[in-house]
Amino acid sequence: MPRDHRTHLFNLGNCLWHSDSSFRPIPAKFSLLSARVVNPKGGNTEFADMRAAYDALDDETKAEIEDLICEHSLMYSRGSLGFLDYTDEEKEMFKPVLQRLVRTHPVHGRKSLYLSSHAGAVRGMSMPEGRLLLRDLTEHATQPEFVHVHKWKVHDLVMWDNRQTVHRVRRYDQSQPRDMRRATVAGTQPTVAQQAAE
């Protein structure tokens, strides 16, 4: 695929911190990624632990964000890379959905931040105020002490829980082959009752 192809450029959004499918009303539960062909330079995947990041917040911040609701859309994440023109069909497909900023894991009950580059607005806040809050929280949550860097080898298989991690791929040499196969396990419930995110 040519480097200037729209699909290729659109997929560069995977270099931003994100949680898979947070732009869907019912986001993904797990993801699995398998390495078939590894790029010789770059292409590591970084994972940030949103449980540890939440635990490290001060009590005042935890109280401030406890009940906040964010709007998630692919138009937010791709917009930050300069994608501003969408067809009417894409606008309908990528309509913002609502997600809680703080999630409680349904199995072990531990709280975590639910951040993603797809989050572009916070309900009840002005756009600049909400985006600054999300940026501050993302900078906090992706500090080195919360991040695992996976350096891929052929046949590696990594599985993660999207409900308590964010991840991103690092830049790599686009002139060299790279073959990664991903599977995603669908979630079973929304993080918040959906309303029209207008």
Residue ranges and their predicted role:
Residues 1-157, 162-198:
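Non-heme Fe(II) oxygenase catalytic core, chiefly the N-lobe of the double-stranded beta-helix
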